[in-house]
Structures are given as structure tokens and as C-alpha cells.
């Protein structure tokens, strides 16, 4: 009798008190679906660490800005420009300042994590399924291409190599973005958080590709071949499941140093090293069901160092621009390079990510998840306009660290990122009541098995 009654109950659209979305049309692929419970737990853990890292990044940025605009600004510049160069390292061109060590050395750890994340996404995450990968990949490409075009349109009349900075507004800083989410205290749905993290991973790949191809002035072949050989040895060892840090860390350092000597930015070595690490457990170790693989293990070990130290220290040494008060800020923003960066981050990023997502929805069978609206996509797209770490790095490569134009780049990146964050906060806060209902629905576990019911729906319906 119960079964008959259940079959006659009509399916209705969600009401304000029923946040469970209706089932998408058969044959369509939902955009921004929440994914599996295991993937959601992993992403939640990653974003929790990135939130702490984002807070430290903001702290490093604020300290640098205050110090650089204080009466003691010369001491900040002196610290940043202090050369740490043992004579043994001179043949490898490693006579670097503290600021350069942060950009070339510490950020290699950040890009090593990016390499691990990217490989994991392609092997065991959302990107392994072409249908699920289509949206974040298209959004990342749109979020790179449109800001670059906007920058070129704004800055093309500036001259003096202004177009060298076309890639500056193409990057997204996930740590900064999740720090903004923490500040505005919004219950962003799991599906959007997953999209943001996956977008940032693909974004990092595009950024490092741009750096390697477009910002390499000279190329020394022998050091490059040496770096690739050492990376191959590193890869062989990790494929054999060797985890001895006393062996792997020296190899990674040698690969980094040789990559730096080759003329290619040393952070590229970090990504390539990350790509070599296996994601899944071997059959001898019990297979994928036995637990996380080596890539996830390495990520757990190194992410706190990346998010909690490497990126904040880089921000401290890179964000310290002497603004000179309101008049100095206005003067900096009169440079069309700075204006192009602001326009690229605020307008270009949002238009590129939102437009690419809409195009996927328009020209494929993919449809927006019923629990979300296009306002949510706009909010996530605006968050994508928070470009900081990689944007500052590309600015230094494009115009030279410490140059006048590099100072204007810093002002543009800071201004554009703050504007994008403010606009995202307005849009997402307006939807926070909806997000809170979705968040509560995603926590319901009526059968008390430790897995929220929404993640069991496909199995139960089957």
C-alpha cells in the first residue's frame, strides 16, 4: 500500500522549504553538479587549508603594503633586495635576492602542488570524465582568453612594451578567493566550490604553460636536458613507490636549479615533478580502494608548507608597492597597463568564465543544475577575477621586478582583485539564504551512515 502511494506522489519543483532540486531532464549533463561524497570531502579539506593560507596571504600583503608606505620603506626595499648568493651557486645563475628566491624558489613548491592536483584531477577526479571536464576547462580557457583581449584593447596605446603584460590578468588565486568566501561568510554550495577549485587547477596549468612559452628570453639546452633527465629519475623513483625524502628532495632541488639555469622559469620544474607522481595505489599496495595514492600523500605533506609559508612569503616580498597616498594611486592607475589589468580581472575574467559556461550550456546537452541560477555562476566568475600570486609573478617576468611599470602592475593587480572580490561578495551574499538551505540539505543523514543522503540519491533511486 505504501509503495502504491509513493508512486502516485507527483514530483514538484523545490519550494523555499524544500531545497532538494528536481531531477534534470534525462540525457542532459548538469552543470556544476556536486560529484561524489569522497571527492566532496577531499575538496572541503583542500579549501579549508587554502582558507588558512589565504588569510596568511592577506596578512603578508597587508604587512608589505604598510611597511612599504611607512617612514621605514627603505628597510623593506633593502630586505627584499638583499642578495643571498653562495659562490658555489654562481655557475647556475643563482645569485638571487630574497625577493627572487621567493618568486623562483618558494613558488616552485606552489606549482608542485598544482602539478599534483592537476594529475589527480585527470586520473581520479572530475577531469577524467570529458563531460564533467568540459565546463571547468572551457571556463578556464575563456577566463584566460577574454581578460588577455581586454588587456590588449586597453593597453595597446601605452607603448614601451606594454603588451608584454597581456597574461597578467589571466590568473586566478584560489587561496585569495576562498579567503574572501570566509570573510563574507557565505555557505557556497558544494557544486560551486568544486567548480572553483577545478577551474583554479586548470588555470594554473594554463599559467605555467604561458610562463614557459612566452616568458623565456633565452634557452640553454644542456641545463634543460639535465633538468629533464633528473625529473625522469625522480619520476622513476616515485613510480617505484620510493618515498625517501632524503633522496627525492635533493633530486627536486637539482632539477629546479638546472631548470633555472636553462632560462625557463624554475617553477616549471615544480609542475613537471608533480606530474610524475602516481595518483592511484598499485595493485601490490591494495589498489585504489586501499586508500589515497602517493600524489594525495605528497599533497597532504606539502600543501601546508605551500599555503602557509611559500605563498604568503612571496606575497610579502612582491606586494610591497609604495603607493604614495591617493594621488599616487591615481597616478599609477593612469598607466594604461594598470587600467588594462583592472579591466581584465574585473570585466574580462567574469565575461570569459560566464560566457564560456553559457556557451557550453547553449551548444551541448549540458544544463545548469536546477539548484543553482546564473547569478551563482556570475558570483563564481567574479571570484575568478581575484588574480594575485601568479599575476604578480607574470608582472615581474613581463616588466622586470622593481621597475616603475612593475609597481604599476602591483597597483593594478591589487585594485582589480579587490574590486572583483567586492562585486563577488555583493552577488554571493544576496544568494546566501538559498546557499544556507542547500548547505543544510547537503548535511542531512537520516540513515546515520556517515554519508549525507544527497550523495546516495543516485544509488537509492537505482
Swiss-Prot record:
Q: Which UniProt keywords apply?
A: Antiport, Cell membrane, Ion transport, Membrane, Sodium, Sodium transport, Transmembrane, Transmembrane helix, Transport
One CC-aspect GO term: plasma membrane
Q: Does the keyword S-adenosyl-L-methionine apply?
A: no
A biological process (GO) of this protein is: regulation of pH
Q: Where are the transmembrane segments?
A: 52-72, 96-116, 134-154, 165-185, 195-215, 218-238, 244-264, 309-329, 337-357, 382-402, 408-428
According to the UniProt record, where is the region Disordered?
Answer: 1-31
Q: Which GO terms describe its molecular function?
A: sodium:proton antiporter activity
As its record notes, the protein acts as a catalyst of: Na(+)(in) + 2 H(+)(out) = Na(+)(out) + 2 H(+)(in)
Compositionally biased, Pro residues: which spans? Answer: 16-27
Tell whether Nuclease is among the UniProt keywords. no
Record's signal peptide:
none
Major subcellular location class: membrane
Please report the record's description of how this protein sits within the membrane: Multi-pass membrane protein
Which superkingdom does the taxonomy of this entry point to?
Answer: Bacteria
The record's subcellular location field reads: Cell membrane
* Similarity-based family: Belongs to the NhaA Na(+)/H(+) (TC 2.A.33) antiporter family.
Q: What does this protein do?
A: Na(+)/H(+) antiporter that extrudes sodium in exchange for external protons.
Q: Which HAMAP family match?
A: NhaA (MF_01844)
**Could you identify this protein by its name?**
Na(+)/H(+) antiporter NhaA 2
Question: Whose protein is this, by species?
Answer: Kineococcus radiotolerans (strain ATCC BAA-149 / DSM 14245 / SRS30216)
The encoding gene is: nhaA2
Amino acid at each position: 500500500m505504501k509503495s502504491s502511494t509513493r508512486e502516485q506522489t507527483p514530483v514538484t519543483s523545490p519550494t523555499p522549504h524544500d531545497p532538494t532540486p528536481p531531477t534534470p531532464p534525462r540525457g542532459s549533463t548538469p552543470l556544476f553538479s556536486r560529484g561524489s561524497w569522497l571527492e566532496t570531502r577531499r575538496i572541503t579539506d583542500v579549501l579549508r587549508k587554502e582558507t588558512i593560507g589565504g588569510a596568511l596571504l592577506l596578512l603578508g600583503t597587508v604587512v608589505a603594503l604598510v611597511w612599504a608606505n611607512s617612514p621605514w620603506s627603505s628597510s623593506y626595499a633593502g630586505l627584499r633586495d638583499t642578495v643571498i648568493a653562495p659562490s658555489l651557486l654562481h655557475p647556475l645563475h643563482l645569485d638571487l635576492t630574497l625577493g627572487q628566491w621567493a618568486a623562483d624558489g618558494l613558488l616552485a613548491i606552489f606549482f608542485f602542488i598544482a602539478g599534483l592536483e592537476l594529475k589527480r584531477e585527470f586520473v581520479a577526479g572530475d577531469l577524467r570524465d570529458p563531460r564533467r571536464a568540459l565546463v571547468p576547462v572551457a571556463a578556464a580557457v575563456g577566463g584566460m582568453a577574454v581578460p588577455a583581449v581586454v588587456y590588449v584593447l586597453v593597453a595597446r596605446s601605452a607603448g614601451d612594451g606594454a603588451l608584454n603584460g597581456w597574461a597578467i590578468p589571466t590568473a586566478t588565486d584560489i587561496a585569495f578567493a576562498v579567503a574572501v568566501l570566509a570573510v563574507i561568510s557565505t555557505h557556497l554550495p558544494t557544486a560551486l566550490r568544486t567548480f572553483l577549485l577545478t577551474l583554479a587547477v586548470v588555470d594554473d596549468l594554463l599559467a605555467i604553460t604561458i610562463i614557459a612559452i612566452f616568458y623565456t628570453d633565452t634557452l640553454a639546452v644542456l641545463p634543460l636536458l639535465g633538468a629533464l633527465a633528473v625529473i625522469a629519475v625522480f619520476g622513476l623513483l616515485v613510480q617505484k613507490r620510493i618515498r625517501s625524502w632524503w633522496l627525492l628532495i635533493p633530486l627536486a632541488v637539482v632539477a629546479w636549479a638546472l631548470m633555472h639555469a636553462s632560462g625557463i622559469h624554475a617553477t616549471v620544474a615544480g609542475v613537471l615533478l608533480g606530474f610524475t607522481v602516481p595518483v592511484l595505489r598499485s595493485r601490490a599496495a591494495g589498489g585504489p580502494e586501499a586508500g589515497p595514492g602517493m600524489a594525495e600523500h605528497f599533497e597532504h605533506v606539502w600543501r601546508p608548507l605551500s599555503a602557509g609559508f611559500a605563498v604568503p612569503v612571496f606575497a610579502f616580498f612582491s606586494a610591497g608597492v609604495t603607493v604614495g597616498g591617493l594621488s599616487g594611486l591615481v597616478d599609477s592607475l593612469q598607466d594604461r597597463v594598470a587600467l588594462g589589468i583592472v579591466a581584465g580581472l574585473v570585466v574580462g575574467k567574469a565575461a570569459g568564465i560566464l560566457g564560456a559556461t553559457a556557451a557550453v550550456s547553449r551548444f551541448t546537452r549540458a544544463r545548469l543544475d536546477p539548484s543553482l541560477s546564473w547569478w551563482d555562476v556570475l558570483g563564481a566568475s567574479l571570484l575568478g577575477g581575484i588574480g594575485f600570486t601568479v599575476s604578480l609573478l607574470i608582472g615581474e617576468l613581463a616588466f622586470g621586478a622593481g621597475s616603475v611599470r612593475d609597481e604599476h602592475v602591483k597597483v593594478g593587480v591589487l585594485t582589480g582583485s579587490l574590486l572583483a572580490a567586492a562585486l563577488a561578495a555583493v552577488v554571493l551574499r544576496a544568494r546566501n539564504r538559498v546557499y544556507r538551505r542547500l548547505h543544510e540539505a547537503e548535511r542531512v543523514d537520516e540513515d546515520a551512515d556517515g554519508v549525507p543522503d544527497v550523495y546516495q540519491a543516485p544509488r537509492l533511486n537505482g
